[in-house]
Regions:
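Conserved catalytic-core segments of large NTP-driven translation/proteostasis enzymes
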Residues: 4-71, 78, 82-84
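C-terminal effector modules of nucleic-acid-centric enzymes and ribosome-associated factors
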Residues: 58-154
């Protein structure tokens, strides 16, 4: 088994031969084998860190933040409307067309603030999320506080 990387089970369990959907590609994959701490397993449960051998996708098609799921409520989006709360410690201006980073879970993507009311972001690359996920907006080039604020996805 060739393990190039590993991931964490965030909810539930995975079993050998389970069929899951890879996001953002929407490819169907099957778990051929599971490894935990160099031991082969038939099943792994949350919050285990695992290595998976997958059928239906190549290792170079998987990136940090990608998700394997059976949950149909997860969506792949390039535009987000959020309920935004600016950090009281961030003193910079927030303007339309301003670039920032958005963080949801382990995913960090570049985004442009399209409008402030309603607060809309246009992402350079797709992000995986569901309604009411918490997100963090970051201004990477800031010399003081980098966290612009947080929000919930509408």
């Amino acid at each position: 088994m060739c393990i190039r990387d590993r991931g964490k089970i965030l909810q539930g369990a995975v079993k050998q031969y389970d069929k899951l959907k890879h996001l953002p590609s929407s490819s169907e994959v099957m778990i051929k084998s599971i490894q935990m701490h160099d031991d082969d397993m038939k099943e792994a449960v949350c919050p285990a860190r695992v290595g998976l051998s997958l059928k239906g996708i190549k290792p170079d098609e998987i990136q940090r933040g990608d998700i394997l799921t059976i949950d149909d409520s997860l969506e792949v989006k390039t535009e987000l409307l959020i309920t935004f709360n600016q950090s009281p410690y961030y003193k910079g201006e927030i303007s339309d067309n301003q670039m920032c980073l958005i963080n949801i879970g382990l995913q960090i993507k570049a985004a442009k603030i399209s409008s402030r009311s309603p607060f809309k972001l246009i992402l350079e690359k797709p992000i995986i999320c569901k309604k009411n996920d918490t997100c963090l907006l970051i201004k990477q080039e800031s010399t003081t506080v980098r966290i612009i604020g947080s929000g919930k996805i509408n």
